[in-house]
Amino acid sequence: MAKRDYFCFVVLFLSSVSAVIDDPQNKQVYVVYMGSLPSLLEYTPLSHHMSILQEVTGDSSVEGRLVRSYKRSFNGFAARLTESERIRVAEMEGVVSVFPNINYKLQTTASWDFLGLKEGKNTKRNLAIESDTIIGFIDSGIWPESESFSDKGFGPPPKKWKGVCSGGKNFTCNNKLIGARDYTSEGTRDLQGHGTHTASTAAGNAVADASFFGIGNGTARGGVPASRIAAYKVCSEKDCTAASLLSAFDDAIADGVDLISISLASEFPQKYYKDAIAIGAFHANVKGILTVNSAGNSGSFPSTTASVAPWILSVAASNTNRGFFTKVVLGNGKTLVGRSVNSFDLKGKKYPLVYGDNFNESLVQGKILVSKFPTSSKVAVGSILIDDYQHYALLSSKPFSLLPPDDFDSLVSYINSTRSPQGTFLKTEAFFNQTAPTVASFSSRGPNFIAVDLLKPDISAPGVEILAAYSPLGSPSEEESDKRRVKYSVMSGTSMSCPHVAGVAAYIRTFHPKWSPSVIQSAIMTTAWPMKPNRPGFASTEFAYGAGHVDQIAAINPGLVYELDKADHIAFLCGLNYTSKTLHLIAGEAVTCSGNTLPRNLNYPSMSAKIDGYNSSFTVTFKRTVTNLGTPNSTYKSKIVLNHGAKLVKVSPSVLSFKRVNEKQSFTVTFSGNLNLNLPTSANLIWSDGTHNVRSVIVVYTT
């Protein structure tokens, strides 16, 4: 009887599923990716997209089906399709992939001083080219009236600029903010603050006396304040869709931006041909445009980063030497030090403390709520929580502090020791963090889930407690109850580290405007400050910070670089078993995969390999080629630094001699060591001519 009931259920279930699939009213938005634009003069993308829809729907009127048409920089469209229509489109000639219109998420000044790019005459700049540099920000829009985007002292936009200012009602561009496009129907004005913050972090003007209610007071500025900004709004207050992202890439590439900064990430890693950011960034790379992308805020577990393509510079978040703390003063006079950005000054007035996890609102009204778990109250004066994981300052709409476990236990002991426990908050102060830089707990980690032999993220940069411009329409704590409005705010996330590296890339480009995206990426990675794990565990190693912490001063003059072009990336995809037919569409030209390409031999600045096995020895080989961008008649000697589990690294040849600039030399690295499930085996290869130290991270792991 049970089996019969189960069988009936399955039949009914499958019947209902079939009915849903075939229901013409059940349409969803899908992205149809068709690769590069055909070079045929008579080809019109929009007409082709419409004809595809007409064919699969059997209807000549399909205007209501088409959502987006990608026709300026690559080929494809977004449309409302039923499941059966999706299947038919996916099977059509000329289609690379069809994937759901998934949602991407926002990955939500002293930081530049920490990086060595100080304000003033001592910082080397090439202002003429910096002013000719255009950074495209794909984000939540921008607040054009911010002082960070004033065009005082700016000349007209560069002649290469082909974009427009279509920001919507009461939105005006200028000679600093030269372009604006909206894909949300809200207008390009930033309603959240995120896009304003990221744009000003990379390219904002120097604004004196910027602070968050007096906290972090100083000069807020971007890494390249003389550069131009183009804002592409893809994030509404509701979502950031794949279809909108691809439209922004399509326009930004054709508009003539020099760099793209995108502080967004999908919830999970996607295959490259189904990832809007990977698709857009690939076509940007082909046009000589580097895409810098946040690694994600999914925390310190392995394989959480979704920014995993080799043609993207993926950025983890780390802290700086400035942090914020908030003191809690108890009724017995003891002071405890926690983390938060608390702008509220209680003037020393003490309030009753109540400890627990679940309370009726009437029990906490007018009191300070103390809890081990995240909680909120509309009527409590403020809250104190335990910080056993975050290790960075959060904002709240009320007085708030995160106490380290020992101090939290001390607070609970005090509460239990008296009938009338009391306490108060002091306003947040800044402190000097001697342990910086360390990777933030929220920053997403590798290993790379899509291409296991490619190390991601690539680099780490400041992303903790960053002060930058903000939208007056946004809540600084992102809480609806927070009615404060500010021009500058403090935010943390890989969303903040991404524009730091975009600013660094733009800074490098001002000295080397003809450098390709891969050369700039290599220069940033091979000159990074070495970092070490700040906590035990597999995901706290190179999988947390990649090559290390960005050093833009050294990156201007890297010595040797690892170059990549379109053909290298296509060969890499061959090694991932993409078919020649698919790659022909992506590349826009004939592709023949040789069948013996190993992804680990992509000429990437880092080296990584996943090996099957456990507690066993291994030997793996990497092949690389470097280009001399230093001085002619130079000789580089190899040096190896062995880390955990590494036994031996052989480099052949161990010495590279160059007679001229732009000369290339190839070498092989043979790495031997022991596999360990708990830690990757790693080493550093350093090529040095006595002036330049070109460092590559080598990581071998098993899972």
Curated annotation (Swiss-Prot):
UniProt KW keywords: Autocatalytic cleavage, Glycoprotein, Hydrolase, Protease, Secreted, Serine protease, Signal, Zymogen
SUPFAM superfamilies given in the database record: Subtilisin-like
Domain Peptidase S8: 111-556
Predominant location category: secreted
Protein name: Subtilisin-like protease SBT4.7
GO molecular function terms noted in the UniProt entry: serine-type endopeptidase activity
GO-annotated biological processes: proteolysis
PROSITE patterns reported for this sequence: SUBTILASE, SUBTILASE_SER
Source superkingdom: Eukaryota
Annotated source species: Arabidopsis thaliana (Mouse-ear cress)
